[in-house]
Structure formats: C-alpha cells, structure tokens
Amino acid sequence: GEPAVRGAGEAEAPASWGRTSGKYREVGGPNSWLGWPKEPDSRGRDGGAWAQFENGYIYWHRVQGDAGPVTMRRDVFERWEREDYEYGPWGYPVSDERDIRIGGEIGQVQDFENGIAVRTPDDDVRLLHGGIAERFMGLGTADRNRLGFPAGDHSATNVPGYFTDFDNGVIYWSQANGTAVIYHGPIFDRYRELGFEGGRLGFLVEDEVINADGSRVAVFEYGTLRSDREGNVTEEDTGVDRKYDSLTDAQKEELGEVNDEGTTRESPDGTRGLYRDYKGGVVYWSAEHGGAVIFSTGVLNLYASTGYESGRYGFLVEDETVNADGSREAVFERGTITMDSDGNVTGSLED
C-alpha cells in the first residue's frame, strides 16, 4: 500500500504504513493535532504497532478489537512511559481520549487494558488502575461530582492494597474488600488521625454513606465511624476494646498504660487483625480467633524475637495461661510457647 505521508513541507517526513496509516488519515493526517510523522511504524508488545508524530502517537493491538488503532496525546504518553509503556501494569491504550465532565469542569479520559488515564482541568495526567479505575468510571453523576477529579496516581497502601486520592476523597482497593469510597469531611479526618488503613480501624470496606441531614457513617474492617449532622464523630468499640473490657482488674493492672495500637501484619496462615500494645503486654483481635491477651514476660519476648504474628508461630489464638506456680503458656496458630516457674522459656511448633 501507499504510505500515508512522504513529505513535511520542505523536510522529508517518515512514512506511516499499515494499520496506523488508516487511523492517521481518519483524524486528518498532517493537518490534524498529530502533525507530521516523526518515526516509521515500530513493533510493540505481543504483535502490536505504534507510530510517533509531532504531537502524539498512534497505537494498535488486537486487544482494541473493533475500536482499531487509537491516538494518544504526548502528555498522556509521557506519564504512561514512566510505567513502562505497554509492558507495564496498564497495558495498551484501547480507546481514543474523550471528554469527562465532573462538577462543572471538563477533563479527558483514555482507556487502557488495565486502567485509565485522566487529564484534569489543570492539565495534570493521572493514572488509575484496575478496580479503582472501574469504580471511578462506574460512579453515578452525583457521587462523581462529590468526589472530584483524581488528585494523585495509583499508590500502594501501608498494608496490602491500593488507593487513589481525589479532590474531595479517596477510593481504596484491597483483595479482601474490593473498592470503597470515602469523602473528605469529619469521618475522613478522624480516620486520618487514627492512621488510615494502618491504624486500628483497618481498611474501608463499604462506601461512606452521607444522609440527607448531613450525618455520615463509614464501615471499616475493625470498626465503624459515625458523624452527626454537626460533624461530631463517634467510634463504635473495636474487637480489641471488647477484649480489654472483658479482662479482670488484675489483668488490666498488669497490662498498664497503652504504648501503641494498629493493624497487625499477616500471619503465615493469612490472618490479619488488630493489636494494642501496653506497657505490660499486648491484646490481639482477629475475626478468625477473636480477642486474646499476652503479657510482657519471657513468653512474649520469645514471640517477639520470631517476628510476632508474621513469624513462625503465627497469630495468638488464646489468652496466655498463668498458673499458680508462675508458669505460663501461650497458644498460637502454629505452636505453643511455655515458661516454667523458674523463667525458662521453650517453644514448640506443630508438625
């Protein structure tokens, strides 16, 4: 076939051949926003093809299906190339960009195999991936207007999962809980104070609900936050709270003051939950095992030396037993640690 372009004014321009040539003609050739070709057609991943022009690119791959080759503006390309082009997590572009109206402002969105690129009204290009991209595009008009344009890129959370910041909120994703939306406001502010998903509430698991009177509720892995219409936030008791409340006065006295609290790491059995570290011990809680307490003795010291719940013993599943002679025993998912009355500590793992 004939090449789409052979010359660019006085200078010779590379020819655009094959599948990209038809798309180039369709958008208007050198008189379009693409301008003149800069490089001949080149091969991409898995049999794809691309051509570079003065102001953008044309990409083709069979994943585009009936859409055929698509254009990409230079600013989107420059952000995408930082993620390793079509070889990276986003894969190939599968649509031309199109306008998207949010809250009275207009930006643009372009689809990729595994996400989207969004150009904001301020001309920032943001990449959204996977479930977060799908959720954003699936929001109704009112919810999307409330959330706004993306204000950040796809980012990893402190515990396994991802989030994207928006002008007025955040979309979270985790393997266990899928996607959920929280908006800026009193509940978001309290969640931030508590350490977001790494704090004692864990991941957001349901969309924040905003009622007609302005009150709000958000459900997390390990608790619920509620805000009245005046913005006063209350927190329902977590599993750690309930476990601590069930302890005897003597046990509470032995634990003493709180040092720290938050979500645990994952155990070898896949268990995650909450912990509250006291001066004299730790209270744990998980959905699988409920609440359990362990005190600051040689038993806890050995457990700590192996990596706590993420180590070879796994999660604490029962309260540490304290016998009349001073000996102690703690049972974990994958073994037991004991201390005799003389303070000698031994650990045994299940086969």
Describe the predicted segments one by one.
Residues 1-351:
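Extended, compositionally biased repeat/scaffold regions that form elongated interaction surfaces
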